From Swiss-Prot:
It is found in: Plastid, Chloroplast thylakoid membrane. This is Photosystem II reaction center protein K. The gene is psbK. One of its GO terms (cellular component) is photosystem II reaction center. It comes from the Eukaryota. It is a single-pass membrane protein. HAMAP family: PSII_PsbK. Keywords: Chloroplast, Membrane, Photosynthesis, Photosystem II, Plastid, Reaction center, Thylakoid, Transmembrane, Transmembrane helix. The chain crosses the membrane at residues 38-58. One of its GO terms (biological process) is photosynthesis. The keyword Transmembrane applies.
Length: 59
């Protein structure tokens, strides 16, 4: 079971590393600034939730 799990993790890590370094086709080159910001969006939602909870005194 552990071998299957490690194989899945290793396989996804190899695919994701090549995915991060892929370039957009020339027709979509104007989306590059948006694509660069997209990985930060979940962090912004986390910070929004933290500020919201601070505003309501962490009820």
């Amino acid at each position: 079971m552990l071998n299957i799990f490690s194989l899945i993790c290793l396989n996804s890590a190899l695919h994701s590393s090549s995915f991060f370094f892929a370039k957009l086709p020339e027709a979509y080159a104007f989306f590059n600034p948006i694509v660069d910001v997209m990985p930060v969006i979940p962090v912004l939602f986390f910070l929004l939730a933290l500020v919201w909870q601070a505003a309501v005194s962490f009820r």
